[in-house]
Amino acid sequence: KPEEIVLLRRWIDDGANAPADEPVPQGPSEHWAFKTPNRTPLPADAGNPIDALLEKSRGKLGLKAQPAAERTILIRRLYLDLIGLPPTREQLEDTRPWKSIVDELLASPQHGERWARHWMDVWRYSDWYGLGKQLRNSQKHIWRWRDWIVESLNADKGFDRMIEAMLAADELAPDDTDTLRASGFLARNYYLFNRTTWLDSTIEHTAKAFVGLTLNCAKCHDHKYDPITQEDYYRFRAIFEPHQVRLDPVPGETDFEKDGLPRVFDDDLDAPTYLHLRGNPKDPDKTRLIEPGVPAILASFAPAIKPVKLPPYAYAPASRDYVMEDRLLDIRAEVQKA
């Protein structure tokens, strides 16, 4: 505002006086979020660790915990939390031990369905759209990724293993078509008309979903608040630069309009990445290549990069035995019609 500019100029003209002992704010890299977490010690007589930590904070504030809710209220909360459905009258009157009810709900298929909805919001699950048969965004048959999420949660698969599969199933499990469904996370970002828009979406939502950072803010310049440089952004892009999407045949079906496995694969390992000056894809700095890597602030957490040898059908899915058998059946059917 003009009046604020006047105040700043007046302050400068007066000598720009400031408190001599004014503390200098810590750099962004000193924020607790970028530090290795330490386990908080719990009292020896602690029951539930969450309750123990809450009680410690309540004590500092002079607060007291509310008494436990009655059992029917707790059962109702439990059902809504774990499976997203209210209990029946009979279930409200269940007298079994609390742990038995919890274990039963955790083992029910509705548990994975209920919690998959929340994670699919974070991971941006979306069916494909286009014009006619033209695919413009996401992928056909992306429901296979949705089913993998539900099944993984119901199988109590570790969150770390789920992330690894969504980002690198094509390299970690090239033989396992069930696990390959996980790469729908990356395939969902597909955008027909602009490769940079496609990769920008991949970078932004991978960082938001898995490291809680707005890496997209560093596309045009260094991040204003987080310790992320513009070069960090393009190093992260270089990780995804080689990848493409495709539909692989599934057993028993050769028509991709009816069914298929949407997935990613490395199409061009030599695809170069350049820093876009001011974020403009029409103005790449071709004086130097950007090597793949995570933001420098996270480098200590990054695993060592190792080459992976893939089977031939990872590049040529039509060479799988079941694909050739299905196509042979199609040909025989056509011959019979003739």
Indicate where each model-derived feature is located.
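Aromatic- and Gly/Pro-enriched helix-to-coil junctions and flexible linker segments
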Residues: 1-170, 223, 243-338
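Sequence context surrounding c-type heme c attachment/ligation sites in exported
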Residues: 1-2, 171-269, 307-314
